[in-house]
Amino acid sequence: GDIDGVVQQSRLNDINPSDIADIQILKGAAAAAIWGTRAANGVIMITTKKGKKGLNIEFSSSLSLDYVNREFQKQDKFGQGVNGNWAANNALSWGDRIADRSGSDSFNTSGAKFVSEDGSVQYPITHKGDQTTYNQSNRDQVFRTGVTWNNNLSISSASEKGSVYFSASDWNQSGVLAGNSDYRRTTGRLNFDYNVNDNLKLSMKNTLAKVFSNRVQMGSNLNGLYLGYLRTPADFDNSDYLGTYYNAAGVGTMNSHRGYRNYLGSAAPTYNNPGWTLNKQVNTSDVTRFIVTPELQYKWLENSTFIARVGYDQSTDRRITYFPYRSAASTSTGSFGDNFITESELSMHLINQSTHKISDKISMDATLGYLYTDRNFFQIGGSAINFIITDQDRYGFFNSTNDNMTPFNSISRVLNDRYYGMFDFDYDDKIFLQLATAAEASSTFADRFWSPSASLSYEFTKDMKIPTLSYGKLRASWGRVGVAPPAYITGTNYVSAGSAS
């Protein structure tokens, strides 16, 4: 491929780690019993902090430095070429032995040339005699010391009537790649709860995150970083990657791209020069995310509590990709993409939790619940190729003609609801039985799906005193879970076909 190679980040990154109080992992059927088919592979439950008694103000600031501690070794014995002979623009590094060269290059200064941004000139080489190798300088073009500043402020307070927790954070990172490789996350959070009386409690959690990132193409990718970097011969200097190419008639082409597969920059090289990938190409993501979760807890019986929770999570993500004119492969004529994505999820969760003492040694915790979710996805954007203006960096659709633009959009909505029950039995605090069942319906499949599960565990170290074993448990479980299909896979799509003569 020539444009793949930028992996979008997990939205878990939107959470400030300093706000996290607890993380729990629920696996398999136990997770699906509560959270449904989306949790068939497990659930990560993250609990954020709440206020502490008194007035608490905390501030932290940290600086981290990142280094690449292991790299691929590159040979420096043989030059560019094949069969023991130096050859310009060749893909391989099986040329002549560098140490056996005469010590200086010969050039043709009467024809084409490449003038780099700093004024240095590259002429066609007629004889390769220079013994200089560039593995170290080429490496230094790619890697740098990564720098991360992490600042956190939190203010919290609590009393008998409730608590409040406020935080703000800023994570600012420049990566170890010496170019368009950076990440910045700014967050704010406000959590509070209020005890109306002994039986009624109100709470709300709010968070806002702003995340901007710019990432470098990677992988087996003609526009990627490592393909061109690792294949660069030891005797080729990657530093002058950008400049003006002049043909034999003296006509100049600005914004030309020079790499070891085209060392005069007369056309796009087969692989990008790493400097071009790092500094000219753009892959940005600009995310704004807002989450609000109000909750009501009402203790309506001595052993029963009713919980009503509503959650709304919305994020917008604008992604821009830019490959300048004379990038590698199919993007050699320029490519631009602008993609705007909005995702939202509305959830309503009704839960009743109760505790029952059956006998002196047997107790049961019962959870009955209903969960409704409404997920929406909207995407609109377009791509443009074959740039009109090629000697300058121009971002936007205005730099292509209409027939070189491709608009696109996508809309998706998925509704789910589920009823569930979970019953946990405890015998003498050593034998535990859990029985659960759920009935789920989704707009992506027709029939309501039942997912029963059961688990039995025995903490045998309560009865067997084993000096070398402080804790031991035997556990067996069974469950049936399913995964809902994606939206609209049973639909018949209309695609406008082109005409051919």
Residue ranges, per PLM feature:
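Short acidic/polar hinge/loop motifs at secondary-structure boundaries
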Residues: 1-27
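Residues on the lipid-exposed face of transmembrane beta-strands in outer-membrane beta-barrel proteins
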Residues: 48, 147, 153-157, 190-194, ...
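Surface-exposed loop/interface segments of Gram-negative outer-membrane beta-barrel transport/assembly proteins
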Residues: 53-133, 176-184, 189-291, 307-417, ...
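Transmembrane beta-strand segments that form the barrel wall of outer-membrane beta-barrel proteins
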Residues: 170-172, 433-445, 476-478
